[in-house]
Amino acid sequence: LQHEDGHSHLMAMTIPTCRAYDPAFAYELAVIVEEGINAMFVRGEECYYYLTVYNENYDMPALPGEHVREGIIKGVYPFKTVTPDGAKHEVQLLGSGVILNEALRAQQILADKYKVASTVYSVTSYPELK
């Protein structure tokens, strides 16, 4: 557990064999761990996984479907879309780890107060997006 550590993923990007992830939900963590075991022990890839996990207490949804697995491993997938009646504008919101909850709160404010449509993306790994 590393409190207020905002730079470890930046440092991990400098190591070619390191795959760094910042999951928001337990199902994301499970998918990443399963992929890590397959990569390192089944396929014999020269890599290791760096995972950040948190101790903040919040609801953990179930895996929304098999369709999100690829996005979790590749680093990003759409988590939730909201389109209020009369929406004329649309934004994309990104979040990882516990910050994803703040993106979801922002999504609700944008919909309720400003009638702005949005999609929240769960970014499980910014480094894997490169």
How would you label these PLM feature ranges?
Residues L1-D5, M13, A20, E28-I32, ...:
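Thiamine diphosphate
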